[in-house]
């Protein structure tokens, strides 16, 4: 658990009424998650939008859910979702996460990266 975390969750059903189901404690984040779910329009997918927390703070708990088969990304970067469409519907093929590399890190870059990762909760 993360004190003060705000979140919005949207889940796209793939059978029955095929609704986007929602949960959350912040209406704006729930609305963001719903927009993502509707834009991708792929059944059995969920979208979690958070603030006041990092993905690493919740990723282990999400992966431990028996209903979660795959996580395509957990990031604060801009993403593009690759969707395949068939007559039956849409399916997520993959995710483009962030931008391509611009170079190789220096010693200073490495120290800054490690300091940043420690703020996210990573341990070395």
PLM regions and their residue ranges:
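Conserved mixed alpha/beta catalytic, RNA-binding, or beta-rich assembly cores of soluble enzyme
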Residues: 1-110, 114-124
């Amino acid at each position: 658990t993360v004190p003060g975390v705000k979140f919005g969750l949207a889940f796209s059903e793939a059978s029955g009424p095929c609704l986007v189901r929602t949960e959350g404690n912040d209406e704006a984040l729930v609305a963001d998650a719903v927009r993502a779910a509707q834009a991708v329009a792929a059944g059995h997918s969920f979208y979690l939008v958070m603030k006041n927390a990092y993905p690493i703070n919740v990723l282990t708990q999400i992966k431990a859910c028996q209903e979660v088969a795959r996580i395509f990304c957990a990031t604060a970067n801009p993403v593009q979702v690759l969707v395949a469409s068939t007559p039956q519907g849409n399916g997520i093929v993959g995710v483009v996460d962030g931008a391509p590399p611009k170079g190789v890190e220096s010693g200073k870059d490495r120290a800054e990266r490690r300091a940043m990762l420690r703020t996210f909760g990573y341990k070395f």
